[in-house]
A protein has these predicted regions:
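N-terminal Rossmann-like NAD(P) cofactor-binding subdomain of oxidoreductases
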Residues: 1-200, 327, 335
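Electropositive phosphate-/nucleotide-binding environments in soluble metabolic enzymes
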Residues: 6, 10, 14, 101-105, ...
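Alpha-helical scaffold segments in soluble metabolic enzymes
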Residues: 15, 19, 110, 161-165, ...
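Small-molecule pocket liners
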Residues: 130, 205, 244
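Short, flexible turn/loop "capping" segments at secondary-structure junctions
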Residues: 141-143, 199, 236-242, 303-306
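Acidic, glycine-rich segments within the central catalytic cores of soluble metabolic enzymes
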Residues: 168-239
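C-terminal active-site/capping subdomain that shapes the small-molecule cofactor and substrate pocket
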Residues: 231, 243, 247-336
Length: 336
């Protein structure tokens, strides 16, 4: 049976392992991370945001080889720093590249050896064969042509449904967005040098304006977006759950009730399980563990004119994104 391997056990990699171990434990045949076995096991067992996993996890060594025991399954763990050097077994037909280091096609393609025919990068890529945010553009995927695939970013997965639903219901004339985004490990805990001088500042002391890779990914996936679409990311001193704020001028008149109805219809129909609806008076911590790509806070919907609107959507930037990553790779393994 064709299976998948995963390189990189950071925030997204570890959550993907949890999800796959619960959904499809038969799919995961190998892992790679430079960290020692005891550290990998500790971080899989204990998570400051998401708590302990729902299955037993342990580490063991046999004949000099490290293994992770995930429930009833034993999965080999390698520690190679270079994708070309990872001895993934012949069962691995697809590699999830989740290290965050190999986002360019040429680097990720170093996995394409032996039985491995496809790679999915768990981050935006400037030159992957295809960037996928299903169902916005998943139908375009051609396994013969697209061998190195990007799963875009958490912000892109949250924003794409908001844009598509507005566009289908009312048409988009102009659109921009901002994301209130949690701290990531590409910031400094204390003031230290960084090429982005704002990110050089202590992450838990300030609101830090910066750029977002989501804009490039969204333009790749939705090439008909209005010219000039862009925005800003505001990094805030929290650990989980982002808020996307989309502002748009529409091609047709809309009121608050009509906008809310469009998102309610989408959440119960074509976007079921990908778009959720928030309970009243929610705050960010209420959305930890939500697996949807975005959870619309319709109480915050505003109209600033008959065609000038603001809509807001929350997303667990870790759980939601890891869930979409697992959706994609599970589908691909079944088709390769």
């Amino acid at each position: 049976m064709k299976s998948l391997a995963l390189n990189g056990l950071g925030r997204i990699g570890r959550l993907a392992v949890r999800i796959l171990a619960e959904r499809r434990p038969d799919l995961l045949c190998a892992l790679n991370d430079p960290a020692p076995l005891d550290q990998v096991v500790h971080l899989l067992r204990h998570d400051s945001v998401h708590g302990c996993p729902g299955l037993p996890i342990d580490g063991l060594q046999e004949a000099g080889q490290d293994f992770l025991r995930l429930g009833d399954r034993k999965v080999p763990l390698f520690h190679a720093p270079d994708p070309a050097e990872i001895p993934f077994p012949a069962c691995a037909s697809l590699v999830v590249e989740a290290s965050g280091r190999f986002t360019r096609r040429a680097d990720a393609a170093r996995h394409l050896k032996g039985a491995v025919s496809h790679v999915v990068i768990s981050a935006p890529s400037p030159d992957a064969d295809l960037t996928v945010i299903a169902p916005v553009n998943g139908a375009e995927l051609d396994l013969a042509r697209h061998r190195v695939i990007s799963n875009a970013s958490c912000t892109a997965h949250a924003t794409a449904p908001m844009l598509r639903i507005l566009d289908q219901a009312f048409g988009l004339d102009h659109v921009g967005m901002s994301t209130v985004h949690v701290v990531t490990n590409d910031q400094r805990l204390l003031d230290l040098p960084h090429k982005d001088l704002r990110r050089a500042r202590a992450a838990f002391m300030s609101i830090i304006p910066t750029t977002s890779s989501a804009f490039g990914a969204l333009h790749q996936v939705m090439p008909t977006l209005p010219e000039g679409f862009g925005g800003v990311a505001l990094r805030v001193p929290t650990l989980n759950v982002n808020l996307v704020d989309v502002v748009a001028t529409l091609r047709r008149d809309a009121d608050v009730a009509g906008i809310r109805r469009a998102f309610q219809d989408a959440a119960g129909g074509a976007w079921k399980d990908l778009v959720g609806l928030a309970e009243p008076h929610a705050v960010s911590s209420d959305f930890t563990g939500r697996a949807e790509s975005v959870v619309m806070d319709l109480d915050l919907t505003m109209t600033l004119g008959p065609r000038f609107v603001k809509v807001f959507g929350w997303h667990d930037n870790e759980t939601g994104y890891a869930a979409r990553l697992c959706d994609l790779v599970t589908d691909l393994v079944g088709r390769i």
